[in-house]
Amino acid sequence: MKERQQKRKGFTLVEVLVVVVILGLLAALVVPRVVGRREDAKRTAAAVQIREIEQALEMYRLDSSLYPSTAQGLEALVTKPSIPPEPRKYREGGYLRKLPADPWGSPFVYRRPGDHGEYDLFSLGADGEEGGDGPGKDITNWE
């Protein structure tokens, strides 16, 4: 009788190590780019939200001939302000259904009068603090 040699099926240790090294290199190249894109997407989303709030502020101004004061804040776009200066006309249902938070979960900052225009509207960015550079830079309505 002939003895048959059984061939083992599987990968050698060297083959497995080569695959692990290749996957590690790919992860080192891809992960930083993906993480950076997420922050870019959040910054873009904040800029879009600022534009939407600006549109609501313009509708408010068209109805009442003025922008909400800093004391009234952006809440004046959701509910009619009860502190002066009260708007002469106020749209039923407000100008926004609710105030959005920025992509990092913080409220937008609104100041009237603004340092850069009739009002300043901005997100504090990823760091949650005014000013900053890079990913922590504020997203504003004037830049």
Language-model features: locations:
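Alpha-helical hydrophobic helix detector
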Residues: 17-33
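Short, glycine/small-hydrophobic-rich surface segments
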Residues: 57-98
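Short beta-to-alpha loop/turn elements within the nucleotide-binding domains of ABC transporters
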Residues: 11, 29, 72
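N-terminal leader/signal peptides at the extreme start of proteins
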Residues: 1-11
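Short, surface-exposed interaction loops/tails
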Residues: 3, 40-44, 51, 55-58, ...
